[in-house]
């Protein structure tokens, strides 16, 4: 299952609790697989709607099952990408422990506050995030002292051919 490109679409499941349970079962399968295959990163997992795996919680509440497995998977070389429209709906631990953060336009004050705190942004920088245009993103990398602004061209399309990822479009 993990030796090739795989997409698991959970959108047809109407009940959010069912989606969450199924997603956690898949996460557990990946976890069990990684325990037996320790070493370099061989697999990348992309989780859309990350709130279903690692929902936001109060600090005094224990981490979710998904959050604990994610923490363990990172130790075993599993690379993970989490996608969320609203950062406040995702565990703050996931956001804090991310090596790369890609931020599109955020308008809600609570989302801006969370991102501002996690990236140590000024009010001016937060105002800029709330006014980002189409294709504009702020990228934060662990090894950079401050986030950078990037423009993504719409004509660049990611394609999967023969298990190699390549960008198509103008260079």
Question: Language-model features: where?
Answer:
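Conserved catalytic network of the ASCE P-loop NTPase/AAA+ motor domain
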Residues: 35-39, 71-76, 93-96
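Conserved H-loop
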Residues: 48, 78, 85-86, 97
């Amino acid at each position: 299952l993990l030796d090739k490109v795989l997409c698991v679409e959970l959108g047809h499941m109407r009940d959010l609790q069912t989606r969450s349970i199924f997603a956690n079962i898949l996460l557990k399968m990946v976890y069990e697989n990684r325990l037996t295959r320790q070493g370099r990163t061989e697999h990348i997992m992309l989780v859309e709607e990350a709130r279903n795996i690692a929902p936001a919680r109060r600090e005094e509440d224990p981490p979710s099952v998904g959050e604990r497995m994610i923490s363990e998977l990172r130790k075993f070389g599993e690379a993970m990408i989490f996608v969320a429209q609203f950062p406040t709906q995702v565990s703050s631990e996931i956001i804090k422990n991310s090596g790369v953060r890609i931020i599109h336009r955020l308008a809600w004050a609570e989302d801006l506050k969370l991102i501002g705190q996690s990236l140590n942004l000024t009010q001016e920088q937060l105002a800029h995030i709330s006014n980002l245009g189409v294709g504009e993103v702020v990228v934060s990398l662990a090894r950079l002292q401050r986030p950078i602004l990037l423009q993504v061209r719409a004509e660049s399309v990611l394609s999967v051919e023969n298990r190699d990822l390549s960008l198509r479009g103008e260079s």
